[in-house]
Regions:
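N-terminal Rossmann NAD(P)H-binding glycine-rich loop of SDR-like oxidoreductase domains
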Residues: 1-6
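Active-site YXXXK catalytic motif of short-chain dehydrogenase/reductase
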Residues: 70, 117, 121
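NAD(P)-dependent short-chain dehydrogenase/reductase
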Residues: 126-181
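Conserved glycine-rich Rossmann-like NAD(P)H-binding loop of the short-chain dehydrogenase/reductase
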Residues: 8-17
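NAD(P)H-binding glycine-rich loop region in Rossmannoid oxidoreductase-like domains
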Residues: 34-69
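Conserved sequence/active-site signature of Rossmann-fold short-chain dehydrogenase/reductase
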Residues: 35, 97, 147-149
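Conserved Rossmann-fold NAD(P)-dependent oxidoreductase catalytic core, especially the SDR/UDP-sugar
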Residues: 53, 75-116
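Rossmann-fold cofactor-recognition segment
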Residues: 24-36
Length: 182
């Protein structure tokens, strides 16, 4: 919304149209799977100043689909945008890339991803860092920790916890021994 208020043209690429609650009339929506390179090339004709890769399969049960959407999708996007030279390519990584590394983590912390999702995110980060080092690709990688906010799906951690607390019910959680530097 803020990008639109600033007068920016916003384009969203997704395999599905946005839910009604998230639909914004001034956004150009392109239905396309970023894991399918030919389709992606066909759908991305113009240049963009800024690219923010929020893409990826949310349900991590299907490991192959999870890997493809997060890693192969990122590689396909960068292949296209290497030729279009955006001002910045922002990759949404994950705190999961660190795995159980000692907290607090920083950019020099050892990464030990434990899930296919985290492995795909780390491979994407390594791919992007390599592009930066070899081709000066303008990348910024953000490793977010429990991002949440308005209009978030109810099947995510923070909404699950809030809903359970309101209803005075138990919610799934760990033993609480993890430390995260937010």
């Amino acid at each position: 919304k803020k990008s639109l208020k600033k007068g920016w043209q916003v384009t969203s690429i997704s395999t599905k149209p946005p839910k009604k609650i998230r639909y914004l009339p001034k956004v150009k929506y392109i239905l396309c799977d970023i894991t399918k390179k030919k389709s992606l090339k066909k759908n991305i004709k113009k240049t963009f100043n800024y690219v923010v890769n929020l893409g990826g399969y949310v349900d991590h049960i299907n490991k192959k689909k999870t890997f493809k959407s997060h890693y192969i999708g990122c590689k396909n996007l960068t292949e296209i945008f290497l030729k279009k030279t955006p001002t910045a390519f922002v990759q949404m990584g994950s705190s999961g890339e660190y795995g159980r590394s000692q907290s607090p983590q920083n950019e020099n912390s050892t990464c030990n991803p434990e899930s296919i999702y985290s492995q795909a995110k780390l491979l994407s980060s390594k791919h992007l860092i390599n592009l930066f080092e070899k081709k000066n690709f303008p990348v910024t990688i953000l490793r977010l920790y429990q991002a949440y906010g308005p209009k978030q799906d109810f099947n995510r951690l923070i909404p699950i916890v809030i809903k359970a607390c309101i209803k005075n019910k138990k919610f799934p959680c760990s033993h609480g021994n993890q430390l995260r530097d937010f």
